[in-house]
Amino acid sequence: KETAAMKFQRQHMDSGSSLSSSSDYCNKMMKVRNMTQESCKPVNTFVHESLQDVQAVCFQENVTCKNGQQNCHQSRSNMHITDCRQTSGSKYPNCLYQTSNMNRHIIIACEGNPYVPVHFDASVEDST
């Protein structure tokens, strides 16, 4: 069975590529990572950093999650991410996405022992 930590890696980790070079990236990745099977997942973020670096965020600044839970953490540094958003005209099973590359701080929820990422909460721009 897929654990929450495994699901996080499937849905949000893409360490292999530093940035999604093609506009087709989200269309391909959302399909390959099984996020268009029963419906189109409307929004998803991929992180192009090493799993080690993303797991380390669990021990960085503690912030409140969007849902009010207290187990979210914000990355100290910017990370290369790709935001995938479903385009307005696309309908299941033909899920189409808009690909946006960004460099932002990520906010993830962590839990368990070992304490690992289980949910991608948000990304934020530098507050400077």
Swiss-Prot record:
A single Gene Ontology CC term: extracellular region
Location of the region described as Disordered in the Swiss-Prot/TrEMBL record: 1-20
Catalytic activity of the protein: an [RNA] containing cytidine + H2O = an [RNA]-3'-cytidine-3'-phosphate + a 5'-hydroxy-ribonucleotide-3'-[RNA]; an [RNA] containing uridine + H2O = an [RNA]-3'-uridine-3'-phosphate + a 5'-hydroxy-ribonucleotide-3'-[RNA]
Compartment list: Secreted
Record: residues binding substrate: K7, R10, K41, P42, V43, N44, T45, K66, R85
GO-annotated molecular function: lyase activity; nucleic acid binding; ribonuclease A activity
Name of this protein: Ribonuclease pancreatic
Organism, scientific name: Choloepus hoffmanni (Hoffmann's two-fingered sloth)
